[in-house]
Amino acid sequence: RKHNISMHLEDDLLMANMDARLIIQVLVNLINNAIKYTPENSNISLNARRVEDKILIEVQDDGNGVLHPDQLFEMFYTENNHSGDTRRGMGLGLSLCKSIVLAHGGKIWVENVKPHGACFKFVLDAVEVKLYE
């Protein structure tokens, strides 16, 4: 499947106390879901920026959006709005993402984007780094 994936990172150095392997797994899962739930040639973007004392990371797509955002992170919950991908998940990926983000003291949620699409967001505590001391 072909998709247009873009990434926008804030110019500043973004640092957080985290297990990088686990947070990468969260990102991989969110991007894989965006690919699975959007038609071919859709746009998917990964954005990261600082918001006050947090780092906000977003994975946004221009697919059909989310039918039940309040249930999406529950274990074994799946939605039936695949766009051309017939693989059916077990409903564990987003639940695992939530567990990982919560274990890091963060928060994860999803918002529908008008006119179409979904934006998965999570925040982690930012860490101040002084490079020239």
Residue ranges of model-derived segments:
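Short beta-strand/loop element within the Bergerat-fold HATPase_c
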Residues: N41-D53
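Short helix-loop "hinge" at the ATP-lid/N-box region of the Bergerat-fold HATPase_c
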Residues: A34-I35
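Conserved catalytic submotifs in the C-terminal HATPase_c
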Residues: N4-L14
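Short alpha-helical Gxxx[C/S/T] motif in the catalytic ATP-binding
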Residues: G93, C97
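Short conserved segment of the HATPase_c
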Residues: V66-Y77
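Glycine-rich ATP-lid/hinge loop adjacent to the conserved G-boxes
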Residues: Y77-R88
